[in-house]
Amino acid sequence: MRFTPASSPSEATSLTRGTVRHPSGYWLDSPDTRPHPHLMPTPTRPPHIDDEKFLDHVTDRLAALPGVRGVALGGSRAQGTHGPDSDWDLAIYYRGVFDPDDLRAVGWQGEVSGIGGWGGGVFNGGAWLTVEGRRTDVHYRDLDVVERESARAEQGRFHVEPLLFHLAGIPSYLLVAELAVNRVLCGDLPRPAAYPARLRVSASAHWHGTARATLAYAKANHAPAGRLTEVAGALASAALQTGHAVLAARGEWVTNEKRLLERAGLRGIDEIVRGGVNEPEGLVHMLGRAEAVLDAAVAEARQSGAE
Protein backbone atom coordinates (compact mmCIF):
# COMPACT_ATOMS: atom_id res chain seq x y z
CA MET A 1 0.00 0.00 0.00
CA ARG A 2 1.31 3.45 -0.92
CA PHE A 3 0.70 6.31 1.44
CA THR A 4 1.64 9.92 0.72
CA PRO A 5 1.71 12.03 2.82
CA ALA A 6 1.92 10.09 6.11
CA SER A 7 -1.22 10.00 8.16
CA SER A 8 -3.34 7.56 10.08
CA PRO A 9 -6.46 5.82 8.75
CA SER A 10 -8.49 7.65 11.38
CA GLU A 11 -7.58 10.95 9.73
CA ALA A 12 -8.84 9.87 6.33
CA THR A 13 -12.20 10.64 4.84
CA SER A 14 -14.17 7.83 3.20
CA LEU A 15 -15.42 8.79 -0.22
CA THR A 16 -16.20 5.68 -2.20
CA ARG A 17 -16.74 2.08 -1.25
CA GLY A 18 -13.46 0.20 -1.07
CA THR A 19 -11.24 3.28 -1.17
CA VAL A 20 -10.32 6.02 1.27
CA ARG A 21 -8.93 9.41 0.26
CA HIS A 22 -6.95 11.56 2.65
CA PRO A 23 -7.92 15.29 2.63
CA SER A 24 -4.60 16.01 0.89
CA GLY A 25 -5.99 14.32 -2.20
CA TYR A 26 -3.91 11.14 -2.09
CA TRP A 27 -5.42 7.70 -1.91
CA LEU A 28 -4.96 4.87 0.59
CA ASP A 29 -5.67 1.15 0.17
CA SER A 30 -5.83 1.40 -3.62
CA PRO A 31 -3.57 -0.13 -6.29
CA ASP A 32 -2.09 3.24 -7.26
CA THR A 33 -1.43 6.57 -5.59
CA ARG A 34 -3.77 8.90 -7.40
CA PRO A 35 -3.09 12.64 -7.43
CA HIS A 36 -5.40 15.36 -6.24
CA PRO A 37 -7.99 16.17 -8.94
CA HIS A 38 -6.47 19.65 -9.42
CA LEU A 39 -3.34 17.88 -10.71
CA MET A 40 -5.26 15.80 -13.25
CA PRO A 41 -5.47 16.82 -16.94
CA THR A 42 -8.30 19.12 -17.99
CA PRO A 43 -11.25 17.07 -19.31
CA THR A 44 -11.20 16.93 -23.10
CA ARG A 45 -14.89 16.16 -23.65
CA PRO A 46 -16.40 19.27 -25.29
CA PRO A 47 -19.08 21.08 -23.29
CA HIS A 48 -22.63 20.40 -24.43
CA ILE A 49 -23.99 23.80 -23.39
CA ASP A 50 -22.62 27.33 -23.29
CA ASP A 51 -21.17 28.81 -20.12
CA GLU A 52 -24.22 30.77 -18.96
CA LYS A 53 -26.58 27.83 -19.41
CA PHE A 54 -24.04 25.61 -17.69
CA LEU A 55 -23.84 28.00 -14.74
CA ASP A 56 -27.62 28.24 -14.49
CA HIS A 57 -27.92 24.46 -14.58
CA VAL A 58 -25.31 23.86 -11.87
CA THR A 59 -26.66 26.67 -9.69
CA ASP A 60 -30.18 25.28 -9.83
CA ARG A 61 -29.02 21.80 -8.86
CA LEU A 62 -26.87 23.05 -5.98
CA ALA A 63 -29.52 25.45 -4.69
CA ALA A 64 -32.02 22.59 -4.51
CA LEU A 65 -29.86 20.57 -2.10
CA PRO A 66 -31.31 20.31 1.43
CA GLY A 67 -29.96 22.96 3.78
CA VAL A 68 -28.44 25.17 1.06
CA ARG A 69 -29.35 28.85 1.43
CA GLY A 70 -27.21 30.34 -1.32
CA VAL A 71 -24.74 29.66 -4.13
CA ALA A 72 -21.86 31.88 -5.26
CA LEU A 73 -19.33 31.81 -8.09
CA GLY A 74 -15.75 32.37 -6.98
CA GLY A 75 -12.20 32.16 -8.24
CA SER A 76 -10.94 33.69 -11.45
CA ARG A 77 -14.33 33.44 -13.16
CA ALA A 78 -15.92 35.70 -10.56
CA GLN A 79 -13.09 38.23 -10.86
CA GLY A 80 -12.83 38.22 -14.66
CA THR A 81 -9.25 36.91 -14.74
CA HIS A 82 -10.06 33.43 -16.04
CA GLY A 83 -8.90 31.65 -19.17
CA PRO A 84 -10.89 29.25 -21.33
CA ASP A 85 -9.65 26.23 -19.35
CA SER A 86 -10.05 27.73 -15.87
CA ASP A 87 -11.94 25.73 -13.25
CA TRP A 88 -15.41 26.69 -12.15
CA ASP A 89 -15.35 27.43 -8.41
CA LEU A 90 -18.72 27.41 -6.69
CA ALA A 91 -19.55 27.76 -3.00
CA ILE A 92 -22.69 26.43 -1.41
CA TYR A 93 -23.75 28.23 1.75
CA TYR A 94 -25.75 26.09 4.14
CA ARG A 95 -27.43 26.67 7.46
CA GLY A 96 -27.39 23.98 10.12
CA VAL A 97 -26.77 20.53 8.69
CA PHE A 98 -25.57 19.73 5.17
CA ASP A 99 -25.22 16.12 4.05
CA PRO A 100 -22.61 15.56 1.29
CA ASP A 101 -24.53 12.43 0.29
CA ASP A 102 -27.15 14.75 -1.19
CA LEU A 103 -24.48 16.17 -3.50
CA ARG A 104 -23.22 12.69 -4.35
CA ALA A 105 -26.77 11.72 -5.28
CA VAL A 106 -26.80 14.32 -8.07
CA GLY A 107 -24.57 11.90 -9.96
CA TRP A 108 -21.86 14.19 -11.26
CA GLN A 109 -18.53 12.53 -11.98
CA GLY A 110 -15.81 13.18 -9.40
CA GLU A 111 -15.06 13.06 -5.70
CA VAL A 112 -17.19 14.48 -2.90
CA SER A 113 -15.63 14.88 0.55
CA GLY A 114 -17.34 14.73 3.89
CA ILE A 115 -17.77 17.80 6.07
CA GLY A 116 -14.26 18.65 7.28
CA GLY A 117 -12.76 16.44 4.58
CA TRP A 118 -10.25 19.06 3.48
CA GLY A 119 -8.62 19.23 6.88
CA GLY A 120 -11.38 20.90 8.85
CA GLY A 121 -11.37 24.54 9.83
CA VAL A 122 -12.99 27.28 7.78
CA PHE A 123 -12.21 25.50 4.50
CA ASN A 124 -14.34 22.58 5.57
CA GLY A 125 -14.66 20.36 2.54
CA GLY A 126 -16.13 20.21 -0.90
CA ALA A 127 -16.04 18.35 -4.19
CA TRP A 128 -13.92 18.06 -7.33
CA LEU A 129 -16.28 17.30 -10.18
CA THR A 130 -16.54 17.17 -13.94
CA VAL A 131 -19.85 18.64 -15.12
CA GLU A 132 -20.61 18.98 -18.84
CA GLY A 133 -16.91 18.60 -19.60
CA ARG A 134 -15.90 21.34 -17.19
CA ARG A 135 -13.75 20.98 -14.07
CA THR A 136 -16.02 22.19 -11.31
CA ASP A 137 -15.08 22.68 -7.66
CA VAL A 138 -17.76 22.96 -5.00
CA HIS A 139 -16.85 24.38 -1.59
CA TYR A 140 -18.90 23.91 1.56
CA ARG A 141 -19.53 27.11 3.53
CA ASP A 142 -21.30 26.99 6.89
CA LEU A 143 -23.23 30.26 7.30
CA ASP A 144 -22.90 30.12 11.08
CA VAL A 145 -19.10 30.01 10.71
CA VAL A 146 -19.17 32.71 8.02
CA GLU A 147 -21.11 35.06 10.27
CA ARG A 148 -18.82 34.32 13.22
CA GLU A 149 -15.67 35.07 11.21
CA SER A 150 -17.25 38.18 9.75
CA ALA A 151 -17.89 39.52 13.25
CA ARG A 152 -14.34 38.64 14.33
CA ALA A 153 -12.90 40.38 11.26
CA GLU A 154 -14.78 43.57 12.13
CA GLN A 155 -12.99 43.45 15.49
CA GLY A 156 -9.63 42.85 13.82
CA ARG A 157 -9.49 39.25 15.02
CA PHE A 158 -8.62 36.18 12.96
CA HIS A 159 -6.46 33.08 12.88
CA VAL A 160 -4.40 31.33 10.21
CA GLU A 161 -4.89 27.70 9.17
CA PRO A 162 -2.77 25.41 6.99
CA LEU A 163 -4.31 24.41 3.65
CA LEU A 164 -2.96 22.20 0.90
CA PHE A 165 -1.26 24.14 -1.95
CA HIS A 166 -0.95 27.32 0.18
CA LEU A 167 2.55 28.19 1.38
CA ALA A 168 1.44 30.82 3.89
CA GLY A 169 -1.79 29.13 4.94
CA ILE A 170 -5.15 30.88 4.88
CA PRO A 171 -6.60 33.50 7.23
CA SER A 172 -10.02 32.85 8.71
CA TYR A 173 -11.19 36.12 7.15
CA LEU A 174 -10.94 34.32 3.81
CA LEU A 175 -14.65 33.59 4.29
CA VAL A 176 -15.36 37.32 4.42
CA ALA A 177 -13.10 37.98 1.43
CA GLU A 178 -15.05 35.46 -0.62
CA LEU A 179 -18.33 37.21 0.11
CA ALA A 180 -16.78 40.54 -0.86
CA VAL A 181 -15.47 39.46 -4.27
CA ASN A 182 -17.56 36.46 -5.30
CA ARG A 183 -20.63 36.65 -7.53
CA VAL A 184 -23.78 35.61 -5.71
CA LEU A 185 -25.83 33.41 -8.02
CA CYS A 186 -28.81 32.77 -5.77
CA GLY A 187 -29.87 33.33 -2.20
CA ASP A 188 -29.53 36.23 0.21
CA LEU A 189 -25.93 36.12 1.39
CA PRO A 190 -24.22 38.67 3.67
CA ARG A 191 -21.90 41.13 1.91
CA PRO A 192 -19.20 43.06 3.80
CA ALA A 193 -19.58 46.80 3.33
CA ALA A 194 -15.82 47.46 3.31
CA TYR A 195 -12.52 46.06 4.52
CA PRO A 196 -12.66 46.48 8.33
CA ALA A 197 -10.32 49.20 9.57
CA ARG A 198 -9.20 47.17 12.58
CA LEU A 199 -8.42 44.19 10.36
CA ARG A 200 -6.22 46.33 8.13
CA VAL A 201 -4.01 47.08 11.12
CA SER A 202 -4.02 43.69 12.83
CA ALA A 203 -3.68 41.54 9.70
CA SER A 204 -0.88 43.66 8.26
CA ALA A 205 1.02 43.52 11.56
CA HIS A 206 0.52 39.78 11.98
CA TRP A 207 1.57 38.81 8.47
CA HIS A 208 4.56 41.16 8.45
CA GLY A 209 5.70 39.88 11.84
CA THR A 210 5.37 36.29 10.67
CA ALA A 211 7.40 37.02 7.54
CA ARG A 212 10.18 38.68 9.53
CA ALA A 213 10.29 35.76 11.96
CA THR A 214 10.43 33.28 9.07
CA LEU A 215 13.41 35.07 7.52
CA ALA A 216 15.14 35.56 10.87
CA TYR A 217 14.96 31.85 11.64
CA ALA A 218 16.33 30.94 8.22
CA LYS A 219 19.13 33.48 8.59
CA ALA A 220 20.11 32.17 12.03
CA ASN A 221 19.81 28.45 11.35
CA HIS A 222 19.57 27.38 7.70
CA ALA A 223 21.78 29.92 5.94
CA PRO A 224 24.90 29.39 8.11
CA ALA A 225 24.63 25.65 7.41
CA GLY A 226 24.35 26.19 3.65
CA ARG A 227 20.87 24.66 3.42
CA LEU A 228 19.74 26.16 0.11
CA THR A 229 16.42 24.33 -0.09
CA GLU A 230 15.36 25.40 3.39
CA VAL A 231 16.43 28.99 2.75
CA ALA A 232 14.52 29.10 -0.55
CA GLY A 233 11.44 27.65 1.13
CA ALA A 234 11.58 30.18 3.94
CA LEU A 235 12.02 33.00 1.46
CA ALA A 236 9.01 31.86 -0.58
CA SER A 237 6.85 31.57 2.52
CA ALA A 238 7.96 34.97 3.80
CA ALA A 239 7.23 36.58 0.43
CA LEU A 240 3.65 35.30 0.45
CA GLN A 241 3.19 36.26 4.09
CA THR A 242 4.36 39.74 3.15
CA GLY A 243 1.94 39.75 0.23
CA HIS A 244 -0.87 39.25 2.74
CA ALA A 245 0.56 42.08 4.86
CA VAL A 246 0.70 44.47 1.91
CA LEU A 247 -2.83 43.79 0.72
CA ALA A 248 -4.21 43.98 4.25
CA ALA A 249 -2.56 47.38 4.70
CA ARG A 250 -4.21 48.50 1.46
CA GLY A 251 -7.57 47.09 2.49
CA GLU A 252 -7.69 44.64 -0.41
CA TRP A 253 -9.21 41.18 -0.03
CA VAL A 254 -7.26 38.00 -0.75
CA THR A 255 -8.94 34.67 -1.56
CA ASN A 256 -5.88 32.60 -2.57
CA GLU A 257 -2.15 32.84 -3.26
CA LYS A 258 -2.19 32.43 -7.04
CA ARG A 259 -1.60 36.10 -7.93
CA LEU A 260 -0.71 37.37 -4.47
CA LEU A 261 2.87 38.37 -5.27
CA GLU A 262 1.83 40.20 -8.45
CA ARG A 263 -0.89 42.13 -6.64
CA ALA A 264 1.52 43.05 -3.84
CA GLY A 265 4.21 44.19 -6.28
CA LEU A 266 6.57 41.48 -5.07
CA ARG A 267 7.15 39.46 -8.23
CA GLY A 268 10.69 40.84 -8.27
CA ILE A 269 11.52 38.51 -5.37
CA ASP A 270 12.03 35.88 -8.08
CA GLU A 271 15.36 37.49 -8.97
CA ILE A 272 16.60 37.07 -5.41
CA VAL A 273 15.58 33.40 -5.38
CA ARG A 274 17.11 32.88 -8.81
CA GLY A 275 20.41 34.23 -7.57
CA GLY A 276 20.58 31.84 -4.63
CA VAL A 277 23.94 30.21 -3.90
CA ASN A 278 25.06 27.35 -1.67
CA GLU A 279 27.73 29.18 0.30
CA PRO A 280 26.55 30.24 3.78
CA GLU A 281 27.62 33.86 3.31
CA GLY A 282 25.74 34.06 0.03
CA LEU A 283 22.57 32.66 1.59
CA VAL A 284 22.74 35.13 4.47
CA HIS A 285 23.14 37.95 1.93
CA MET A 286 20.19 36.63 -0.09
CA LEU A 287 17.96 36.67 2.98
CA GLY A 288 19.10 40.17 3.85
CA ARG A 289 18.18 41.42 0.37
CA ALA A 290 14.79 39.73 0.62
CA GLU A 291 14.17 41.22 4.06
CA ALA A 292 14.85 44.73 2.77
CA VAL A 293 12.54 44.30 -0.23
CA LEU A 294 9.69 42.85 1.83
CA ASP A 295 9.98 45.45 4.61
CA ALA A 296 9.93 48.26 2.04
CA ALA A 297 6.79 46.86 0.40
CA VAL A 298 4.92 46.79 3.71
CA ALA A 299 6.07 50.30 4.66
CA GLU A 300 4.91 51.66 1.30
CA ALA A 301 1.52 49.94 1.60
CA ARG A 302 0.99 51.31 5.10
CA GLN A 303 1.96 54.79 3.99
CA SER A 304 -0.43 54.74 1.04
CA GLY A 305 -3.19 53.35 3.26
CA ALA A 306 -2.75 56.19 5.74
CA GLU A 307 -3.06 58.89 3.07
Q: What annotation goes with each model-predicted range?
A:
Residues 78, 143-145, 252-254:
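Short, solvent-exposed loop/turn segments at secondary-structure junctions
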Residues 9, 23, 46-50, 206:
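Short, surface-exposed alpha-helical recognition segments that flank or form part
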Residues 49, 181-307:
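Conserved nucleotidyltransferase catalytic core and NTase-mimicking acidic/glycine-rich helix/loop elements
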Residues 39-72:
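Helical scaffold of the NTase/Pol beta-like nucleotidyltransferase catalytic core
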Residues 74-109, 125-140:
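Catalytic metal-binding acidic patch
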Residues 22, 26-32, 36-38:
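Intrinsic-disorder-associated, low-complexity terminal segments enriched in Asp/Asn/His/Tyr and depleted
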Residues 41-47, 110-223:
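Conserved NTP/Mg2+-binding pocket subregion across the NTase superfamily
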Residues 2, 6-17, 21-27:
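Low-acidity, Ser/Thr- and Arg-rich intrinsically disordered low-complexity segments
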